[in-house]
């Protein structure tokens, strides 16, 4: 649950703004929000950012005379975390950094809140509350090993299987183009994984017992859960069909791996949508897919709903191309197991 509150005070009037919105997972990183209207003399928070050390940079539109900020681990302000406020530029008082005194006070994936008040030299003030999720400063590295991109029937959902190349945390790592039209991407929750583990993301979820295996104590009871891999689940029951697609794994905007595939019977000369074409270009420009982003250089098989495409991960190989991938018919699909 994310909440963003802004209270503005001037010497003659009080204006209160409130904004409330929700999302499905705390693993999503905070986004910049603009809700500023009204008297242009009011102090405005024009931007804020969070870095890998959970330092929060605040940028205001006016020079600030007084600033006070605190960090809390709960929205009710009962768990105060020791923090410091530092001015970032000597020439002007518009940019400040709020930092933790003890970096271990906020772990990867932990929620925390920055609350503060600023005043300019005319007495105009701004009260603000921003919520964040502890940054992933130790991301794991994933490589795609198998994809079943089409849906046949319940409970056989589409899935993407990934091998952990470098141990670390999954928190905030995204899989692009595996969700709905409104929510096309999936974001992993906080979960520490070890090198050599297999991760399976099931695009759909039909069972209440299908739980994300964020640690070893959780065993998912989903119908197609793998006893050989760590299972994670989308919350969808219905998804658009993707016969041709560009799937990307990225962490903080950096592409880790990608797969580009197209249905050989469709004879498409271009990607079916601009979003897929952009994802394909991103995969190519990042250097993980070769030799181009064009659909002609994607994997070309007639992939039926019961089939998958897979490959054997080559150690220290950072680039992928269509020739590395093979079609696995229904009996050869190895969901959650090492590929043959």
Where do the model's predicted regions map?
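Solvent-exposed beta-edge/loop recognition patches
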Residues: 103-108, 190, 195-340
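C-terminal motif of bacterial Sec signal peptides marking the signal peptidase cleavage site
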Residues: 19-22
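Buried hydrophobic-core signal for structured, non-transmembrane domains
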Residues: 56-58, 158-163, 246-249, 309
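A structural motif detector for short, solvent-exposed N-terminal "entry" segments of globular domains
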Residues: 24-39, 47-51, 124-179, 236-243, ...
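Short alpha-helix capping/helix-loop boundary micro-motifs
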Residues: 182-189
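Aromatic sugar-binding surface patches on proteins
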Residues: 90-100, 198
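Short, surface-exposed alpha-helix to beta-strand junction/turn motifs within ectodomains of secreted
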Residues: 61-86
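Short, solvent-exposed loop/turn segments at the edges of extracellular beta-sandwich modules
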Residues: 118-124
